[in-house]
Amino acid sequence: MYKRQIIISPDLAFRAEATTGEGSIWHPDRNTLFWVDIEGKTLYEYIPDLQNCRSWQFDRMVSTVVPETDSTVVVALQNEIIRVNLTDGNTTSIASIPDNNGKIRCNDGKCDPSGRLWIGTMGFGAPKGAASLYCVWADGTVETKLTKVTISNGIVWSANKKYMYYNDTPTRKIIRFRYDDSSGDILYDGVAVNIPEGTGSPDGMTIDCNDNLWVAQWGGGGVYCYNPYTGDLLTKIVVPAPHVASCAFGGDKLDTLYITTARAGLSEEQLEEYPLSGSVFCCKPGAKGVPANCFH
């Protein structure tokens, strides 16, 4: 499992105190990093040249952001998918997501190669099997893809568009599905990675140009890179925060990995030991990402 393992320490990109910093994604048209603070109900745009963030506040939790155009993004609020105009802040509704009378909220999501938004959910308190995975089309149609999920997370697609990788956090496994890009149909194809004991649980995830999976591990203090064909752990990025929630490749060459973290669930003692929890980190791990898919 630990063949050729490389260990890397990241730099601090932007100091923040996000309760749960999540949903990191590099906007290919704006060359900036978008991310969210779920409980803070805030969308952020990190501008590397300025080393600062713009922000947009919402009236509900916000968990996912994906690019659409150079002036718009699509955001998952607690129970709704909306379009946000980044110039004037105006929003329009795209689709509603079932919330079981306020017991369920949106969690992680990304667009597939054909521009459909896949958005997963979780229950408040994370009751087992209460959540689902949905696919949202540009016309607002919502398809149910998976049910009996607990905490839907980490979804990416292979370069050849034949496989989708996904995790339900408490299972501590990354699942591979056969994927049909024209229809969006998926078929279970086995376990790609079993998360090693003592390294936390899989949260957000991104994929590099060689199809290796970079997985933010909640409670694992790092981002872990796996070969999805062998399950081998290749690289560990040791982050100075126990709860690592998401990661995304960015920068002009897509060779910088940005990492978001959380303060949620940490004791006062842990926050004293890890004061940068809730911040955004970055490093160049020797791999290149792939451009984010836009909603269309």
Where are these regions (language model features)?
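Conserved beta-strand positions in repeat-built beta-propeller and related beta-rich domains
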Residues: 27-28, 33-38, 74-79, 119-127, ...
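Beta-rich, blade/repeat-based domains predominating
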Residues: 16-30, 58-74, 100-116, 145-163, ...
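Loop/turn-rich, solvent-exposed surfaces of beta-rich toroidal or solenoidal domains
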Residues: 173, 177, 194-230
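Conserved small/polar residues in nucleotide/adenosyl-binding loops
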Residues: 1-5
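A short loop-to-beta-strand structural motif that recurs across blades of beta-propeller domains
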Residues: 42-44, 80-82, 131-134, 173-175, ...
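A short beta-strand motif characteristic of beta-propeller blades
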Residues: 9-15, 51-57, 92-99, 141-147, ...
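Hydrophobic alpha-helical segments and helix pairs
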Residues: 90-147
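Short loop/turn segments immediately following beta-strands, especially the blade-tip
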Residues: 177-185, 285-290
